[in-house]
A protein has these predicted regions:
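A generic structural motif
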Residues: 47-50, 238-241, 299-309
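A generic secondary-structure signal
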Residues: 36, 77, 108-112, 155-159, ...
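Active-site-proximal loop/turn and secondary-structure-junction residues that shape catalytic pockets
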Residues: 22, 33, 51-53, 89-93, ...
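Short acidic, glycine/proline-rich loop/turn micro-motifs
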Residues: 56-59, 133-137
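C-terminal functional modules
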Residues: 294-380
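Residue-level preference for long, well-ordered alpha-helices that form the structural scaffold
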Residues: 26, 63, 67, 98-102, ...
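Catalytic-core regions of glycoside hydrolase
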Residues: 19, 119, 135-295
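Feature activates predominantly on carbohydrate-active enzymes
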Residues: 1-111, 115-119, 126
Length: 380
């Protein structure tokens, strides 16, 4: 398969990538996501929580019995909701690309997921050093990380069981955005990374990409067309909204998705959102992401958000959620400017009313998740 046709009317893949750093969501929270998302057009879930050791740090090891039973149950629940469960492997740290053994290890682990019904797998090389670590890899791949990653996927593709005709593979390359923060964190990337990767990667493999930045304010059709022209493979956007991990953990991204070109489905195969660490609160911004993914041309951020709040909490709660959202946005602006939060008397009154609303619902799951921000509101 080649790149998605620019005449495509909608994203083929729509859903969530649980790909953040921090405590993974519970199985119960994931099931609630499936029910919530399936009703809003979600059809894909990529399992890739950075802090699941068997996904990343200990990826070569099988899941222990209890953990596997829970995962198998989750896979079955996804299938009941007609959601494609995508299992992500993160083998990047210390991987010896020139060795055959890691490919066989990955395929052996994938076979268990295949037996449970998984038909899409992702290999994730995000957030690892930008240069090959081992001399044998540097000799074999000409010191090119891009060539090594493409060749590794080609080896997986070639060695998978012949019966896996319905299996799809995705790749998240180490260079997943032109954001300069990537090079500062992991080292400068080789020139022509995407072109080199494209030449080595099987055409059937789709590629994940976050956009012009790791956490982009805007993603335009022009940007994704330019990336697609270099990569020449189907693109799946890994959109880091509304995620709030790492340096963003004090932020509460509950507003609507914004700044996404309504024409992106013309050039993008899939669109996945990385969610909040707080799963119950996270359903609010995700509702707007699902609205965009299902009908990008008709999407109106504020109308979608108001409808999501009303559906979840009732129309009378809308002013309180507007106040909570406004407070968090004001707090972020103040932190960025390194100054105290500045609020008008009217804004303080609205925040106090919102605080009383939160107090009335303090025993609900979402209210427990918002407790740190409620404390900040009281102190404002």
């Amino acid at each position: 398969m080649g790149p998605v046709s620019e005449r495509s009317p909608a994203f083929t893949r729509r859903g969530v990538v649980e790909g953040f750093f921090g405590p993974p969501w519970s199985m119960a929270a994931r099931r609630r996501l499936f029910a919530f998302g399936a009703a809003r057009g979600m059809n894909t879930y990529l399992y890739a929580p950075k802090d699941d050791p068997y996904h990343r740090a200990r990826w070569t090891e099988p899941y222990p019995r209890a953990a596997w039973r829970a995962l198998a149950g989750l896979i079955a629940d996804a299938r009941r909701h007609r959601i494609d469960f995508v299992y992500g492997f993160h083998p990047g740290a210390g991987l010896r690309f020139a060795d055959a053994a890691p490919v066989q290890t990955l395929l052996a682990k994938a076979a268990r997921f295949h037996d449970a019904g998984v038909r899409t797998f992702a290999v994730l090389f995000d957030d690892i050093p930008s240069r090959l670590e081992h001399p044998a890899d540097r000799r074999r791949f000409g010191n090119s990380l891009a060539r090594a990653q493409g060749a590794w996927l080609a080896a997986i593709h070639a060695r998978q069981p012949s019966a896996w005709r319905d299996v799809e593979w995705w790749l998240c390359p180490s260079y997943y955005s032109p954001d300069p923060r990537l090079a500062r964190a992991f080292g400068a990337f080789e020139p022509e990374f995407l072109e080199t990767l494209a030449a080595a990667l099987p055409q059937e493999v789709a590629c994940l990409w976050t956009g012009p930045a790791i956490v982009p304010e805007r993603i335009t059709l022009g940007h994704v067309r330019a990336v697609a022209a270099r990569l020449r493979h189907r693109l799946i956007l890994w959109d880091n909204y509304p995620v709030n991990d790492l340096a963003m953990r004090d932020e509460l991204h509950i507003g609507p998705l914004a700044g996404r070109d309504p024409r992106l489905p013309r050039a993008v195969h899939g669109y996945l959102n990385n969610p909040l660490l707080q799963p119950e609160l996270g359903l609010l911004p995700l509702a707007t992401c699902f609205d965009y993914a299902a009908a990008a041309a008709a999407y109106r951020p504020e109308a979608s958000w108001a409808a999501a709040v009303t559906a979840r909490f009732g129309a009378r709660a809308l002013p309180h959620w507007r106040a909570i959202r406004a407070f968090d946005e004001a707090r972020r602006r103040a932190q960025k400017a390194q100054r105290p939060v500045r609020l008008s008397a009217q804004a303080r009154a609205r925040i106090r009313a919102a605080g009383r609303y939160l107090a009335r619902h303090r025993d609900e799951r979402w209210a427990r998740e918002i407790a740190p921000w409620r404390a900040a509101m009281r102190a404002a």
